[in-house]
């Protein structure tokens, strides 16, 4: 049988050191302490970011699906990084024009791509300060610029 953990009166230091070393195996702990959310993610740790639309693109979905998912290439204002963002709902790409200012949010699970859209980690939420959902439901109109 193994020795197990120390249980004596004077074993606190040993237990603390052991716990401190083994916490680095936890991915969430490691990411939090190393600050990777600020270093690696294009949003720099925030939930949303504004950007300028560079171009509209269609991305083919992964197998076994067959579709062209409507996306846009966006350059973020805060740091100049270029990202691809999904435009949700049927016909919403018509509301987005090049050089429009859009608000992006995360899309999918913990910074990874969602579903059958490869490499797309963000979605468009607002266009020119107006909610994309409101435009789609025809509750609001896009401001003339």
Curated annotation (Swiss-Prot):
GO terms for biological process: translation. InterPro entries: NA-bd_OB-fold, Ribosomal_uS12, Ribosomal_uS12_euk/arc. Keywords: Cytoplasm, Ribonucleoprotein, Ribosomal protein. GO terms for molecular function: structural constituent of ribosome. Its main location: cytoplasm. GO terms for cellular component: cytosolic small ribosomal subunit; fungal biofilm matrix; ribosome. Belongs to the universal ribosomal protein uS12 family. This is Small ribosomal subunit protein uS12. It comes from Candida albicans (strain SC5314 / ATCC MYA-2876).
